[in-house]
Swiss-Prot record:
Signal peptide: none annotated. This is Floral homeotic protein APETALA 1. The gene is AP1. Transmembrane segments: none annotated. It comes from Arabidopsis thaliana (Mouse-ear cress). Changing L212P: In strain: cv. Chi-1. It comes from the Eukaryota. GO terms for biological process: cell differentiation; floral meristem determinacy; flower development; meristem structural organization; positive regulation of DNA-templated transcription; positive regulation of transcription by RNA polymerase II. InterPro entries: MADS-box/MEF2_TF, MEF2-like_N, TF_Kbox, TF_MADSbox, TF_MADSbox_sf. Changing M120V: In strain: cv. Jl-1. Gene3D superfamilies: Transcription factor, MADS-box.
Length: 256
């Protein structure tokens, strides 16, 4: 005997209602996954329990993309169908759309921070883990890139400083070499000034043949007598000129 058709109505028993919700939810998620795989369709499924607990399924964790596509499509369709006089209604719908989008972003942010994870299924947790891993890879890649660029910049600065130091060392060595040469030159000049002056050539006294050793020193004897070995001898020089002794001069001639 076959199973009878179940009548669709609200289950009054709270426990039975919760059990049925869990079973039907699992079957619904399974069907959504099957149709997305078999038909290569983009599927987005959102379910709220009677307690307000959220359950969702999306193809390849692209819930946001699917919802944005749905919103653009439905908004464009409504714009074509809605009359121009229904401007206020369109603004209200746009407000509701943006509000729902903000709520979705806030919920995803809480999930990324590790909050409100109790309502997520194992599949959703796995998708969230993959998203976080991908984000961490991007962060590490960017960090490594910045570190590599910083290291290259520091290496360039180090090379420039080394070249500058080499140039300064070369200039210092050249300057020291010049100063050393100048110091040696100054030392040589100072040694030349401190040496005693050279002796002049020896001057030989050239005596005139007429300047002999017997050169009389004329003198005047006042009131005395001039005595020689030979009192009567005449002093004779090399010119054969006789000099009268001074004492022979009569001093009386000077009296006048």
């Amino acid at each position: 005997m076959g199973r009878g058709r179940v009548q669709l109505k609200r289950i009054e028993n709270k426990i039975n209602r919760q059990v049925t919700f869990s079973k039907r939810r699992a079957g619904l998620l399974k069907k959504a996954h099957e149709i997305s795989v078999l038909c290569d369709a983009e599927v987005a499924l959102v379910v709220f329990s009677h307690k307000g607990k959220l359950f969702e399924y999306s193809t390849d964790s692209c819930m946001e993309k699917i919802l944005e596509r749905y919103e653009r499509y439905s908004y464009a369709e409504r714009q074509l169908i809605a009359p121009e006089s229904d401007v206020n209604t369109n603004w209200s719908m746009e407000y509701n759309r943006l509000k729902a989008k903000i709520e979705l972003l806030e919920r995803n942010q809480r999930h990324y921070l590790g909050e409100d994870l109790q309502a997520m299924s194992p599949k959703e947790l796995q998708n969230l883990e993959q998203q976080l891993d991908t984000a961490l890879k991007h962060i590490r890649t960017r960090k490594n890139q910045l570190m590599y660029e910083s290291i290259n910049e520091l290496q360039k600065k180090e090379k420039a400083i080394q070249e500058q130091n080499s140039m300064l060392s070369k200039q210092i060595k050249e300057r020291e070499k010049i100063l050393r040469a100048q110091q040696e030159q100054w030392d040589q000049q100072n040694q030349g000034h401190n040496m005693p002056p050279p002796l002049p050539p020896q001057q030989h006294q050239i005596q005139h043949p007429y300047m002999l050793s017997h050169q009389p020193s004329p003198f005047l004897n006042m009131g005395g007598l001039y005595q020689e070995d030979d009192p009567m001898a005449m002093r004779r020089n090399d010119l054969e000129l006789t000099l009268e002794p001074v004492y022979n001069c009569n001093l009386g001639c000077f009296a006048a």
